[in-house]
């Protein structure tokens, strides 16, 4: 495919995730601080006679390239809303670099990347908030992934707002996954129902993040004990924060310096060649 358009599905992490209540509709009220890493899946697209999707990359196996894929659903939704004259058919290639069912956005990041690609090239009048409102209902975290910038999420995670004075762009981060998928639904279902209090993040974000938590970590450990091993190993490599993201199994560590992050990655790569590792910085 001769690609003329390109976007990145930035990896999402939950720097903290407080579960506050189980709702009558089966969903949960949460408070979370979303952040994004400067790496992820890539989407390339070119004008075509009809929509097509090809998926390649390390984590392509088992993914559907049919109309049920979120990438094509976003394309179809925007075309239905704005017309085929404004949103033409595209041949799309999705390169999967992020593990699946891993707590770092994955399909939501890809859907948001497709939405941004269409916006950039065909619907430039759409702002992030409008785009998120349109495509957000297609899946959890898509609304946050549209802008892919640090923000607080509440409700089911789709009520988004900025945190005044929070400047964490450029913080070195290391992502680690044991290559074991963890389904989100069962982890939320196994939450113990105890509200352990709200999430507050202000300008003293380091101390506040250290004092925060991921309430899904305990139920995720039951599904994937390797999470405990990862957190123990990360903690020994002296980050200022190590925590599980989302419903797992990916864990992250934040460091003071890129050299410390890179040294930690080298240690883990040597000790655990089967683990997936990605070094980057927060956007």
UniProtKB/Swiss-Prot annotation:
It holds the Pfam family GHMP_kinases_C. It catalyses: 4-CDP-2-C-methyl-D-erythritol + ATP = 4-CDP-2-C-methyl-D-erythritol 2-phosphate + ADP + H(+). Its EC number is 2.7.1.148. Gene3D superfamilies: 3.30.230.10, GHMP kinase, C-terminal domain. Keywords: ATP-binding, Isoprene biosynthesis, Kinase, Nucleotide-binding, Transferase. ATP binds at residues 99-109. Transmembrane segments: none annotated. This is 4-diphosphocytidyl-2-C-methyl-D-erythritol kinase. The active site is at 12, 141. GO terms for biological process: isopentenyl diphosphate biosynthetic process, methylerythritol 4-phosphate pathway; terpenoid biosynthetic process. One of its GO terms (molecular function) is ATP binding. InterPro entries: GHMP_kinase_C_dom, GHMP_kinase_C_sf, GHMP_kinase_N_dom, IspE, Ribosomal_Su5_D2-typ_SF, Ribsml_uS5_D2-typ_fold_subgr. Pathway: Isoprenoid biosynthesis; isopentenyl diphosphate biosynthesis via DXP pathway; isopentenyl diphosphate from 1-deoxy-D-xylulose 5-phosphate: step 3/6. The lineage of its organism: Bacteria, Pseudomonadati, Pseudomonadota, Alphaproteobacteria, Sphingomonadales. The keyword Membrane does not apply. The keyword 4Fe-4S does not apply. Catalyzes the phosphorylation of the position 2 hydroxy group of 4-diphosphocytidyl-2C-methyl-D-erythritol. Belongs to the GHMP kinase family. IspE subfamily. It is an enzyme of class 2 (transferase).
